[in-house]
Regions:
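Substrate-binding groove/exosite segments of carbohydrate-active enzymes
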Residues: 1-111, 117-122
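Short, surface-exposed loop/turn segments at secondary-structure junctions
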Residues: 6-10, 93-95, 167-171, 192-197
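Short runs of predominantly hydrophobic/aromatic residues within well-ordered alpha helices
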Residues: 17-20, 147, 203
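Acidic/His metal-coordination segments adjacent to aromatic residues that form catalytic metal sites
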Residues: 55-67, 126-143, 187-191
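Extracytoplasmic/periplasmic, Sec-exported soluble proteins
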Residues: 70, 74, 94, 139-149
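Core alpha/beta catalytic barrel or barrel-like domain that forms the active/cofactor pocket
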Residues: 117-125, 147, 153
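Active-site neighborhood of glycoside hydrolase catalytic domains
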Residues: 144-194
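Single conserved hydrophobic/aromatic residue that forms the stacking wall/gate
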Residues: 195-205
Length: 205
């Protein structure tokens, strides 16, 4: 936690973004994030591409290409962390100041979706499988994890649009949220098993 939220101090020193929102509740509970959080979001918006895509690392010192550049679970930090800040401090400044960038990212995810399902990314990274093989998501389909983040982003963007007084965007994201939830349920909801895929761990969860 010095300038950049690095993955670890000994090997992966880049600012991998998923950790920021995943440990966000702990960060906001234990530390004064009033300076660091806005800096993280500035790094993200500085790194954001012209089409709205948010790379997996910010600052982006190196581009890994393909999946390692673009994953919803990582990029969604631009949407999720400003709301964690708002929930902790009651300050919506980060949301209102970065609203356009947040819109561009969610609109980018929409452009990558097919029938409401987002299918790209790294998924549930480093889940454990028999034999110790790690890395890419093995137990849970990438579309399930990616689309779940997309849904959460749409829900938050509906709130963000309301905060800035943009009725058109509020209706847009609210309507899209409902449509994507329906698509998610059609794709992944099984009445006897709740939300599931063919993976055993999914059925258990």
């Amino acid at each position: 936690m010095q300038s950049v939220m690095s993955d670890c101090p000994h090997r992966e020193k880049l600012g991998w973004l998923e950790q920021d929102h995943l440990v966000g509740p702990s960060l906001f509970y234990n530390f004064d994030m009033t300076q660091f959080c806005p800096k993280i979001i500035r790094d993200i918006t500085d790194t954001q591409k012209s089409d709205g895509m948010v790379p997996t690392t910010a600052p982006q010192y190196v581009s890994f290409g393909n999946l390692f550049d673009d994953s919803p679970e990582w990029g969604s930090t631009l949407i999720i962390m400003p709301f964690q800040y708002y929930e902790q401090y009651g300050d919506s400044t980060i949301i209102t100041r970065n609203y356009n960038a947040m819109c561009r990212y969610v609109d980018y995810l929409t452009s990558r979706s097919k029938d409401g399902i987002v299918s790209h990314g790294l998924g549930d990274w480093y889940d454990v499988v028999e034999g110790g093989k790690s890395g890419f998501c093995h137990n849970t389909p990438i579309p399930l994890v990616a689309t779940a983040h997309y849904i959460y982003d749409l829900k938050l963007m509906t709130c963000a649009a309301r905060m800035v007084g943009n009725k058109t965007d509020e209706t847009k994201y609210s309507t899209l949220y409902n449509k994507v939830v329906e698509a998610f349920n059609r794709e992944f909801y099984k009445p006897c098993l709740l939300y599931t895929s063919d993976a055993a761990d999914d059925r258990i969860s």
